[in-house]
Amino acid sequence: MTDQLKRAISAAQTAQINDQQAEATRIASSSAGDQTFDMSESSYKTSHTAIRKARRFAMQGLYEWLVTDRRFDIDGKLGWKANAPHDIAARTRATNAMHTVHIGYYHEMMRDIPEQIDALNTLITQQLDREINKLDTVEHAILLIGAYELQNRLEIPYKVVLDEAMKLNNHFGATDAHKLINAVLDRMAVELRAPEIEADSKANLRTSQKAAAKPALKTDNSTNNNADIDTTTVAEKPTASNKPRISANNTSVKRNSASKALANISDYKASKQNDAQNMVEESIIKPASIEPVIADKANAFAASAENIVNHQPVEENVPASNDVNDNTTSLAEVELLDSNSVDVDIKGVDIKNIDVKEDASESVELNDADAKNQD
């Protein structure tokens, strides 16, 4: 047998002996109630989520311990105790991916809560209206974790402890169990965290007073603003100004000057005067257009009279000449009547023209007066 083979056999024998010794130590410690945890982890998660997951695994481990070894211990069946808390923790780590769990806090709860079980049960019983053995096992495990954190982990606020207990009950507890858990832990917090609760109540009182004072200040400011607005509206009256007004959309200066208003008024007057003159020119009939008509009529009557005289025979007697004279006189009278009627018509037209001119002048004067009043 070579030396290398001898060394391998001796190493296997020493390893077997070491395993036997470790098993014997484990059995002895579990029977004696001693718990040994490996707390040398330095790379486990320490965030709030990791601590929450540690609570969940601890609640499951405590539930398993309460229904096995703890029950056997109460019943006096010590020979049945074969499920120590450290064994539960070891199996949990071996069968679950716990790389996102706060391993140190998980092992701490699995070690300290079973060691302090009697003191924690006393705290819980003081706030219960029933015996603790009548509690559901899940509710009992949640209350143990909450009581442990309220008593030993003072760095965790009591509101966080109550909130995490409610979340554990939502995952594992009964429907209405949150009422009992919340009531027990709230009363327990009043006893164990009295300074914290007092400080929290004072802070809440200050915030409520500030919140109540803010609307009053706002109303006072609003009334002052309304008063300022009223005084400014009374004091400031709209007055005409010749200052340039600059538009926000256009950088050019817009001037509301008096010259622009006067120019608009003068244009309005000129347009009214032109309209009046056009009306007068359309309504007036010029005498020059009437005179050729009168002359034509007179020439026609004279020509007709000459024709009548020239065509009469010489041999006619005196009555014939009298008839001619009568005809000529009648023609002359007709001409006079026509001329008189034409003169009357011309005079009537002139009178109408004069009336139209007077109306036009009066309308122009009224427009001028209105424009002055507007200025």
Curated annotation (Swiss-Prot):
Name a GO CC annotation attached to this entry: cytosol
Q: Does the keyword Transcription apply?
A: yes
Its keywords, alphabetically, are: RNA-binding, Transcription, Transcription antitermination, Transcription regulation
Q: Where is the composition biased (Polar residues)?
A: 219-255
Whether Transcription regulation counts among this entry's keywords is yes
User: What's a Gene Ontology MF term here?
Assistant: RNA binding
Disordered, as annotated region? 25-44, 203-255
Which GO BP terms sit in this record? DNA-templated transcription termination; transcription antitermination
**In which domain of life is the source organism classified?**
Bacteria
Functional note: Involved in transcription antitermination. Required for transcription of ribosomal RNA (rRNA) genes. Binds specifically to the boxA antiterminator sequence of the ribosomal RNA (rrn) operons.
- What family does this belong to? Belongs to the NusB family.
Q: What is this protein called?
A: Transcription antitermination protein NusB
